[in-house]
Amino acid sequence: TYYTPDYETKDTDILAAFRVTPQPGVPPEGAGAAVAAESSTGTWTTVWTDGLTSLDRYKGRCYQIEPVAGEENQYIAYVAYPLDLFEEGSVTNMFTSIVGNVFGFKALRALRLEDLRIPPAYAKTFQGPPHGIQVERDKLNKYGRPLLGCTIKPKLGLSAKNYGRAVYECLRGGLDFTKDDENVNSQPFMRWRDRFLFVAEALFKAQAETGEIKGHYLNATAGTCEEMMKRAVFARELGVPIIMHDYLTGGFTANTSLAFYCRDNGLLLHIHRAMHAVIDRQKNHGMHFRVLAKALRMSGGDHIHVGTVVGKLEGEREVTLGFVDLLRDDYIEKDRSRGVYFTQDWVSMPGVLPVASGGIHVWHMPALTEIFGDDSVLQFGGGTVGHPWGNAPGAVANRVALEACVQARNEGRDL
């Protein structure tokens, strides 16, 4: 009853594309129906309380199944969920329903959520990014080029004062941002409050010297939501422009709370995706990163890491650009060659700046400006701090390379 090939999808339905690998002997339709049932109203037996509700109104439906080209016994199952199954404005509830129990299902050898279509009616219940791309540019007064960042290394072990010094050196050399590593929270060698104070000092000093607005992603991620908010409040009191959160390890509920605070208080929010590969690396099980990226845009963040296409981490170019567009643009056409399974209309929800980071350095600059365009943050960790003359010359090298590439592109040269 959950496999309904003649179903016409509604504009308000949440649509999901699952890559299903059934156990031997299980027909694909059966597997698709099982996914739809288990992630909506079904249970393993018929219960008398089914008669007290309208299953037709509330059940998920598998409405299309297609074999995956070049893979044996793998199918894409399309499932439509009625909007009423989900709590408004809760990414947490959306995921609990769609990817909750069903991934441990016996009839399936493996299951991967490839894409979600978020209908405008549901998207409108989310605040989305605290500020978005345009507001960020206006706050920073930086236009017509990608922004430059750098993660402070060594990520663990520096004292707060030396950490602030490293931040200052990078920023005075010409970077726009520096970043706490995702593992930097509040450890014995550097407590968060000390770090925040020294970094704020570095920011204002670099700003005064260069005449440009500078930021450092102060990581507010913590063991409890209360502690996280305390750090965010302290950052606001210091007058810094941006803070940071690890949204997968911190959780969507915490992230959404933080995003609301950031919008109310004029803070930009940088999002790191630590733990994403646990979920998205396997080709036939888990969740594709484009789903995690869409979820982040709904939950709220102004920057998110997306890999590089050229550095040390995995990522295919077309597919990466597919979810980069899903983060930045308002309306994205379905395009299977880029992994976009559904046309997505974000109805004016602010966009998220993609952050390219991971093993990139100055030689990659032409490729990066070409691939990511102006609306991006290019983040060079070792690619700045690894400069033989130090942080500031490393920062200068990156800024000069970026300005040169942008100028060449604007003159119509091929990078």
UniProtKB/Swiss-Prot annotation:
Pfam families: RuBisCO_large (PF00016), RuBisCO_large_N (PF02788)
Gene3D superfamilies: Ribulose bisphosphate carboxylase, large subunit, C-terminal domain, RuBisCO large subunit, N-terminal domain
Domain of life of the native organism: Eukaryota
Cellular-component GO terms for this entry: chloroplast
The EC number(s) this enzyme carries: 4.1.1.39
UniProt-listed GO biological process terms: photorespiration; reductive pentose-phosphate cycle
Active site: residue positions: K153, H272
Catalyzed reaction equations: 2 (2R)-3-phosphoglycerate + 2 H(+) = D-ribulose 1,5-bisphosphate + CO2 + H2O; D-ribulose 1,5-bisphosphate + O2 = 2-phosphoglycolate + (2R)-3-phosphoglycerate + 2 H(+)
Cofactor binding, per record: Binds 1 Mg(2+) ion per subunit.
Comment field (misc): The basic functional RuBisCO is composed of a large chain homodimer in a 'head-to-tail' conformation. In form I RuBisCO this homodimer is arranged in a barrel-like tetramer with the small subunits forming a tetrameric 'cap' on each end of the 'barrel'.
Family of this protein: Belongs to the RuBisCO large chain family. Type I subfamily.
Subunit and interaction comment: Heterohexadecamer of 8 large chains and 8 small chains; disulfide-linked. The disulfide link is formed within the large subunit homodimers.
Listed name of the protein: Ribulose bisphosphate carboxylase large chain
Organism in which the protein naturally occurs: Cibotium barometz
